[in-house]
């Protein structure tokens, strides 16, 4: 793929993720939008790593670290949402003020 196509796709994924993160009221949807943002960042890291110096794999290695963080978030996030749903009977972000009680 050409550089412009990858960057446009990455910007599109990032903007969808930001829009969904800002407007979502459901915690599960917010987690999915956060995953979109992280995937867009990974696409940029790999693309620019290949563009500037294809012999060094700094962007690729950093992308693997971001994937590991996203995997941890994908494993722990739904467990936290499940626990909040069990205690509060809701997964809406604006109804879960956990610092009050």
Curated annotation (Swiss-Prot):
It catalyses: a plastoquinone + NADH + (n+1) H(+)(in) = a plastoquinol + NAD(+) + n H(+)(out); a plastoquinone + NADPH + (n+1) H(+)(in) = a plastoquinol + NADP(+) + n H(+)(out). Its main location: plastid. GO terms for molecular function: oxidoreductase activity, acting on NAD(P)H, quinone or similar compound as acceptor; quinone binding. The chain crosses the membrane at residues 2-22, 32-52, 61-81. Pfam families: Oxidored_q2. It is a multi-pass membrane protein. One of its GO terms (biological process) is ATP synthesis coupled electron transport. It is found in: Plastid, Chloroplast thylakoid membrane. Gene3D superfamilies: 1.10.287.3510. GO terms for cellular component: chloroplast thylakoid membrane; NADH dehydrogenase complex. NDH shuttles electrons from NAD(P)H:plastoquinone, via FMN and iron-sulfur (Fe-S) centers, to quinones in the photosynthetic chain and possibly in a chloroplast respiratory chain. The immediate electron acceptor for the enzyme in this species is believed to be plastoquinone. Couples the redox reaction to proton translocation, and thus conserves the redox energy in a proton gradient. NDH is composed of at least 16 different subunits, 5 of which are encoded in the nucleus. Belongs to the complex I subunit 4L family. This is NAD(P)H-quinone oxidoreductase subunit 4L, chloroplastic. It comes from Chloranthus spicatus. The gene is ndhE.
